[in-house]
């Protein structure tokens, strides 16, 4: 699996968390700007996009514009994290771009990764 990291904040923390949790199941984890990351996803150079910002949804602005809303899911926003079952349902529905708040990285990435690698 090839992952790109976009969003406005905590890019290195997302990448480090992903490396720790997914290990050798990933062939690449690349930190990029939002537009480049979304373009990599659309062109098939990446399989998944992860990004954080202060609102959760803002990390997906370029992904929504470039790959479409039907491929994107806001996993957390201030004061609200989706239930694990909801996150898993988004992965199983074929969503490939996920946005969340920086403070929720440790709560949401394990669920996303587990769902990706078990689907």
Set out the residue ranges of the language-model regions.
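C-terminal binding/interaction regions
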Residues: 2-6, 11, 78-119
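Metallocofactor- and cofactor-centric catalytic cores in central/energy metabolism, strongly enriched
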Residues: 5, 31, 45-49, 94
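Short beta->alpha linker loops
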Residues: 9, 32-36, 54, 103-104
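A short, gly/pro- and small-residue-rich
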Residues: 61-78, 113-119
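Glycine-rich phosphate-binding loop
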Residues: 34-70
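Juxtamembrane/disordered regions of integral membrane proteins
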Residues: 8, 12, 28-31, 71-77
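Short glycine-/acidic-enriched loop or helix-start segments at secondary-structure transitions
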Residues: 14-15, 59-62, 109-110
């Amino acid at each position: 699996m090839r992952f790109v990291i976009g969003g406005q904040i905590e890019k290195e923390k997302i990448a480090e968390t992903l490396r720790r949790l997914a290990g050798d199941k990933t062939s690449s984890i690349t930190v990029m700007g939002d537009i480049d990351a979304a373009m990599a996803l659309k062109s098939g150079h990446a399989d998944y996009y992860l990004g954080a910002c202060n609102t959760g949804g803002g990390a997906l602005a370029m992904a929504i514009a470039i790959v479409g809303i039907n491929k994107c899911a806001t996993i957390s926003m201030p004061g609200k994290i989706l239930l694990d079952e909801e996150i898993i349902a988004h992965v199983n529905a074929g969503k490939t771009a996920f946005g969340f708040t920086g403070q929720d990285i440790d709560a949401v990435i394990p669920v996303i990764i587990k769902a990706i690698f078990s689907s």
